[in-house]
Amino acid sequence: MKSGRFIGVMSGTSLDGVDVVLATIDEHRVAQLASLSWPIPVSLKQAVLDICQGQQLTLSQFGQLDTQLGQLFADAVNALLKEQNLQARDIVAIGCHGQTVWHEPTGVAPHTLQIGDNNQIVARTGITVVGDFRRRDIALGGQGAPLVPAFHHALLAHPTERRMVLNIGGIANLSLLIPGQPVGGYDTGPGNMLMDAWIWRQAGKPYDKDAEWARAGKVILPLLQNMLSDPYFSQPAPKSTGREYFNYGWLERHLRHFPGVDPRDVQATLAELTAVTISEQVLLSGGCERLMVCGGGSRNPLLMARLAALLPGTEVTTTDAVGISGDDMEALAFAWLAWRTLAGLPGNLPSVTGASQETVLGAIFPANP
């Protein structure tokens, strides 16, 4: 069974940077050693945002974007290796999620698309890459997401305490770790995505640092109720979503009914939308004793305060409290999934994704010997 140092690479729907994590992984433990966040150039970020919202690209433009993202991921890995004084031979493999540009797990021909050419990563780092983690699950009738609950269960499940792990990235997803029950998990809806999109358009900022804008505004209750009526929120699990659904166009359609509103009030309303949709799903799933939060949203003081207020019987903490950086959780999960793939072990949970069976995930792009 392959064990040793692995690197996880994650570029999420928030597009707030490329997260790269170095960890030692074997069948008994996952030990994080180092991490870094690598910036995404503004032009590349905008190109990804455009394609996620349905803007047409030529095949040439699409191919260029795929290559450029692969090169960006490789640069991020090489920066971490240099920082840690490591060589390619010191790493077993890289687990790279890729950049999701479209996720449509239902319909006539279910599919999901992550780009960032893994061949570029192998060529530029000299390290074997495991990528394309989601499509095997979809081929077996699953949603292809979320995949991280399997990792949450392996690291954070407790024999007697009802726990849930909440990842607030661009999309928020919940892992249900309830003793005596199959692991559950699904996307609750927008996490940081709409908040980030709004402040990017209104103030040119990548995100609302310390929720300054949101805390300066007031929740617009009619707008909140209008958004909460979206059918996704009442759809039963398994379910998953992404930027192709909850995007700036979605927000604009709701704002048409509310002309002239204060931008800070919209920011406050979007924060409340995220908090309310998450807390409702926690309660609908039977509640928990401890909610452990990770992802960029775990650094949002308003979101954390609202979750604690909406879930008075639950201890709301970050995963940092149990020794796992909330900023690095997803990248660490894909390093672990790469280890599972190389070990020939399944990486999905049918109870979470709805797939017909457990399966080994991903495609392996081997480095030259």
Curated annotation (Swiss-Prot):
Functional pH dependence: Optimum pH is 10-11. Inactive at pH 4.5.
Top class in the EC scheme: transferase
Keyword Transferase assigned: yes
GO biological process annotation, one example: amino sugar metabolic process
CDD domains xrefs: ASKHA_NBD_ANMK (cd24050)
Catalyses which reaction(s): 1,6-anhydro-N-acetyl-beta-muramate + ATP + H2O = N-acetyl-D-muramate 6-phosphate + ADP + H(+)
GO molecular function terms noted in the UniProt entry: ATP binding; kinase activity; phosphotransferase activity, alcohol group as acceptor
HAMAP family (UniProt xref): AnhMurNAc_kinase
Name of this protein: Anhydro-N-acetylmuramic acid kinase
Annotated organism of origin: Escherichia coli (strain K12)
